[in-house]
Structure formats: structure tokens, C-alpha cells
Amino acid sequence: KSVLIYNMQKYYLLLIISISAILFNCAGRKIDLEEELSINFNKALKFFNNGKYVRAKDEFQYIIMTDPGSKIANESQYYKAEALFFMKEYEDSWDAFDQYIRFTNDIEKVEKSRFRICECAIASTNIYQRDQKQTIRAVEQLQMFLEDFPNSYLIQDAENAIIELRNKLAKKDFEVGRLYLKLEEYESALIYFRSVLNNYYDTNFADDARIGVMFTHILNDNRKGAKNYYKAEKNRFINTQKGLEAKALINETEEGLSLSHYFQLYK
């Protein structure tokens, strides 16, 4: 019996020693990995700061794949997203920032990342002549940013970006209205001019849309409609010069449009 007890004690002692050795070895490897990745991170950060964004992105990606979920991997995810942004890979950058936001507790970087997502959306928009779905998406992202970070130091930048994007959307509708006007599709022209006034009344194109409505009535042999519209809208012109231009359009077209008016229409 004593021999059996001795053997069991010996077995458990060996087991404890083996487990301790394994744990010590694992801990050592963990420390070695952390040291290795710290070196990689500093190397990647140096590439990033020197504007070598492709090299930086690859190095940060290596860290993310080698030790996923770690603090250094999460920090690498942020800089990978930044590198992609500067590489003008805006959709990939958006995805990378979104991934970073999900797993970080750094509120300051969350705010910066959310605004970067807005910038990615803005950079993905088309010129006004093309489809404007991306512009609408960018406005929505900026509005969500304003709601989520009402005290952000980036508020003014976000508001200015919204103004610029809304002007682009207004210009799109205004130019479509002008096109229909030139094609003598008067009802369609009015739809687009009114869209500017209903949806983008605070933009630079609102006054132009009012004048566009007046032009439409005049070209459609409806001077009375043009005069009544001017009377109803004359105090709503944002720009004084545009208001005077509208008044002159009524006063100078009793006998029809002159060459200068057609130039104004088709310029």
C-alpha cells in the first residue's frame, strides 16, 4: 500500500512539473510573440509615417492575422484603415474602419474613424452629371455622425460637407430641369425645378430654380403664370441680385424673350 501511495505521489509530482513546464513554455512563446509583433508594429508605423502606405498596410495586416483579437492587432486595424484611406481605396478603408469600431473601446479613435467613414463616402461620390446615390449615402453618413457626436470638434467640417453635397444634389436636379426646358418638356422641367425648391431650398440653386420656373411659364406662353409666381416668391429670394434678375425677367419680356434671355437660358 505504501508503495502504491509513493507511486501516485511521484506521478502527480511529475504531472505538476510537466504542466508547469508547458505553461512556462507557452508564456515564453507569448512574450516572444508580443516582442516580435511590437517590432513589426513599429516598422509598420515607420512605413506609414513616411507615406509608404502599401508597405504599412501589409505589415499591419500581418500583425492582425498573427495575433487576432489582441490589443496590438486592434491598433494595427486602425492604421491599416488609415493606410487604405491614403491609398484612395475608399470602400476597403470604410470596411476596415467599421471592423475597428466593433472591437475597440477607444472613444477618441471611434469618433475619428466614424468621420473617416464619412470622408470615404464623400470621396466615393460622382460628379453631378452622374448617378447621385453615393452622394445621398454620404449625406446620410454625415447626418448620423452629427447625431452621434454632437460635441465633436469635427462638427463644422461635417456641416460644411453636408452643404457642399446638398448643393451637388440641387445642381443635379436644376440641370435636369434646364435640359427639359430646352427640350420644351415644360411639365418635366417644372417637376425638377420644384424638386430643388422642395428638397434643397437652402442651397445656392434655390433662386436659380425660381427663375427656372418663371422661364418655363414664359416659354410655355403663360406670362400670367410667370408674373403670379414672381409675386408669390419675390420675398423668398436668398440672393438680392437673383431677385433683381427675376424682376427684370418679368419687366423685359412683355414682347417675348430677347437674345440675351435665350443666352441666359442656354449658357
Predicted regions and their residues:
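Sec-dependent bacterial lipoprotein signal peptides
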Residues: 1-26
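Acidic, polar-rich low-complexity tracts and alpha-helical solenoid repeat scaffolds
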Residues: 9, 23-267
